């Protein structure tokens, strides 16, 4: 039985949420948990999950409109669980309210012999994929789910990889031998069965065609398969199939130190560079209690915005190519090369510098950095004006994108859309403005919005974000504060080398942090940022060790791709190519 509300000290936000639940649902049992991220965290019994989440979405005074994330934790080997309900596996629902600019985390304890709860796919449609992922990775079932199939691993996979008793290294497996019989079985498992997805093979007038688009197709932007149900060339329905790029990024975190996992984050949104490091190191710093110096914060912002520009240029060029223009993609990749020259001069690497550190950045800015950036700022602004004439005013580009792939603001919130895709529907919500981090509150920039939510508007928002990133970088250039580029906190990694020969304590700390990695105190924290493709967050569970007990990577592209059937029904295959291009995703960000 869980603890009653009045016996637990609660924040004002928790008081309001729980009091609202009690008024509506009557007496309920729950536990309140304090976390390092200060997000109200409420444990409830599995029998009332559906009712509680339904109320938080539809009946609360200020609704939590978005299911931001849904994941699980295998608690069986966790040591530090004082004051928490007994649980073998824990479901974690993370909701966001844009009205109150607040979050709530709902946790559900499950016993190993009773791993099933009611599905919430009827409340939030984006829960469909999240629940499939939890089933695939942990073996937790969801009663009433329409298609509870594996999603990141092949249909023939055995076991649930994010369980603690599942092996973490390929060297722990036996040799892999692909016999002809096994190859045929694997291929047969990939055969699409329309009935399993609730699809009909025939209409009243004709037979439907089922077309595989991908996984090897240049217009699906990665190893990604969409099964299209067609009547003629019109799309009746679609089934996106992901997982071909899954590499076990979350599992890898359980065997890397807090420091050595940083390069792995670069490979999630592989066009975002250090933008991937940002939420991870901030989550570690939140757990460790590290305060980052102002110079390091400003350097982080500047590098993140440079990578935002680089990523958006790839989007702009490939989107124009997808709808029939060839020249722009070459021009924009040339511009991205200029950005990479600056990044390489500062970080030493181009696409994946892994340059952020726990407590700061890897090194101070090199001599002449300001001149390189100042030259680039003047160059890129003029190029954007030329691209506007070349692409955005082109009547064929407009014909292929205006009114195509549109969704409403309500649909965007239901499906978990964030970033440019959300702002294209008219909601000017940007993490850098609404919940500023790393010093963004000291900078002036606008939040571009549109109102039609179609392919064209999504491109417009991306372009205007490039202009705002240039504006932010100029302010970083003109107002870079003096001071250290790394915190002197004892858990900063690597620690300051200068102090190692002065006293024994810092020498010991340096040795331990470099050889074993820092030991973080037990706790939990979710830190999110406004990344290139939407809101990206890292949910870390520390158990007093040198490695993460659980690392959850919440990426924007995962829910975005799930919308494809909704916005492609009734369109043509050619329209689908424009729709896919306008979403702005990479498959590593989806599959992790």
Curated annotation (Swiss-Prot):
PANTHER family from the entry?
NADH-QUINONE OXIDOREDUCTASE SUBUNIT C_D, NADH-UBIQUINONE OXIDOREDUCTASE 49 KDA SUBUNIT
- List, alphabetically, the Gene3D superfamilies matched: Cytochrome-c3 Hydrogenase, chain B, NADH:ubiquinone oxidoreductase, 30kDa subunit
List the GO terms this entry assigns under cellular component, sorted alphabetically: NADH dehydrogenase complex; plasma membrane
Cite the residue spans of the region called NADH dehydrogenase I subunit D.
207-592
Q: What is this protein called?
A: NADH-quinone oxidoreductase subunit C/D
Task: Give the record's subunit note.
Answer: NDH-1 is composed of 13 different subunits. Subunits NuoB, CD, E, F, and G constitute the peripheral sector of the complex.
Originating organism: Acidiphilium cryptum (strain JF-5)
Does the keyword Lipid metabolism feature in the UniProt annotation? no
* HAMAP family with a match to the protein in the record: NDH1_NuoC, NDH1_NuoCD_1, NDH1_NuoD
Question: What is this protein's gene name?
Answer: nuoC
Q: Which GO molecular function entries does the Swiss-Prot or TrEMBL record give?
A: NAD binding; NADH dehydrogenase (ubiquinone) activity; NADH:ubiquinone reductase (non-electrogenic) activity; quinone binding
Q: What class of enzyme is it?
A: translocase
For this protein, the Enzyme Commission number is 7.1.1.-
InterPro entries documented for this protein? NADH_DH_suC, NADH_DH_suCD, NADH_Q_OxRdtase_suD, NADH_quin_OxRdtase_su_C/D-like, NADH_UbQ_OxRdtase_30kDa_su, NADH_UbQ_OxRdtase_49kDa_CS, NDH1_su_D/H, NiFe-Hase_large
State the function annotated in the UniProt record. Answer: NDH-1 shuttles electrons from NADH, via FMN and iron-sulfur (Fe-S) centers, to quinones in the respiratory chain. The immediate electron acceptor for the enzyme in this species is believed to be ubiquinone. Couples the redox reaction to proton translocation (for every two electrons transferred, four hydrogen ions are translocated across the cytoplasmic membrane), and thus conserves the redox energy in a proton gradient.
């Amino acid at each position: 039985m869980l603890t009653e509300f009045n016996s637990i000290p609660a924040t004002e936000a928790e008081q309001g949420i729980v009091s609202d639940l009690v008024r509506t649902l009557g007496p309920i049992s729950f536990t309140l948990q304090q976390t390092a991220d200060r997000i109200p965290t409420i444990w409830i019994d599995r029998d009332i999950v559906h009712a509680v989440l339904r109320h938080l979405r539809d009946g609360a005074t200020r609704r939590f409109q978005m299911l931001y994330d849904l994941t699980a934790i295998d608690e069986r080997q966790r040591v530090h669980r004082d004051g928490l309900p007994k649980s073998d596996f824990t479901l974690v629902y993370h909701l966001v309210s844009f009205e109150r600019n607040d979050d709530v985390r709902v946790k559900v304890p499950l016993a190993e012999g009773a791993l099933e709860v009611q599905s919430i796919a009827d409340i939030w449609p984006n829960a469909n994929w999240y629940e499939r992922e939890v089933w695939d990775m942990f073996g937790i079932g969801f009663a009433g789910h329409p298609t509870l199939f594996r999603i990141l691993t092949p249909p023939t996979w055995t076991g649930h990889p994010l369980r603690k008793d599942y092996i973490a290294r390929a060297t722990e497996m036996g040799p892999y031998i692909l016999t002809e019989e096994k190859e045929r079985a694997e291929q047969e498992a990939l055969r699409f069965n329309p009935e399993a997805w609730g699809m009909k093979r025939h209409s009243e007038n004709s037979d439907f065609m089922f077309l595989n688009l991908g996984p090897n197709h240049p217009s699906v932007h990665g190893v990604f398969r969409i099964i299209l149900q067609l009547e003629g060339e019109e799309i009746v329905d679609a089934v996106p199939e992901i997982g071909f790029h899954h590499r076990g990024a979350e599992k890898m975190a359980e065997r890397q130190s807090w420091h050595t996992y940083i390069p792995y984050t670069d490979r999630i949104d592989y066009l975002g560079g250090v933008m991937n490091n940002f939420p991870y190191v901030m989550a570690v710093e939140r757990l460790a209690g590290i305060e980052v110096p102002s110079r390091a914060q400003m350097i982080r912002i500047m590098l993140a915005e440079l990578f935002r520009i680089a990523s958006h240029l790839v989007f702009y060029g490939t989107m124009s190519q997808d709808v029939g223009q060839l020249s722009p993609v070459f021009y924009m990749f040339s511009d991205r090369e200029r950005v990479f020259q600056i990044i390489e001069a500062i970080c030493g690497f181009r696409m994946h510098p892994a340059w952020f550190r726990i407590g700061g950045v890897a090194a101070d800015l090199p001599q002449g950095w300001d001149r390189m950036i100042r030259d680039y700022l003047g160059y890129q602004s003029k190029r954007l004006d030329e691209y506007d004439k070349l692409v955005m005013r082109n009547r064929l580009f407009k014909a292929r994108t205006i009114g195509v792939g549109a969704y409403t603001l309500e649909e965007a919130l239901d499906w978990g859309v964030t970033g440019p895709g959300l702002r294209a529907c008219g909601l000017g919500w940007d993490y850098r403005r609404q919940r500023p981090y790393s010093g963004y509150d000291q900078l002036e920039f606008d939040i571009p919005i549109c109102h039609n939510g179609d392919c064209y508007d999504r491109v417009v928002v991306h372009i205007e974000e490039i202009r705002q990133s240039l504006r932010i970088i100029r302010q970083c250039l003109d107002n870079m504060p003096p001071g250290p580029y790394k915190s002197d906190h004892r858990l900063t990694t690597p620690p300051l080398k200068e102090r190692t020969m002065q006293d024994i304590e810092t020498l010991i700390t340096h040795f331990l942090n470099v050889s074993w990695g820092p030991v973080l105190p037990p706790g939990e924290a979710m830190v999110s940022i406004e990344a290139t493709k939407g809101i990206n967050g890292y949910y870390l569970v520390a158990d007093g060790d040198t490695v993460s007990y659980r690392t959850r990577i919440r990426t924007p592209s995962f829910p975005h791709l799930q919308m494809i059937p909704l916005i492609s029904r009734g369109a043509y295959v050619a329209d689908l190519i424009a729709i896919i291009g306008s979403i702005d995703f990479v498959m590593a960000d989806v599959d992790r």
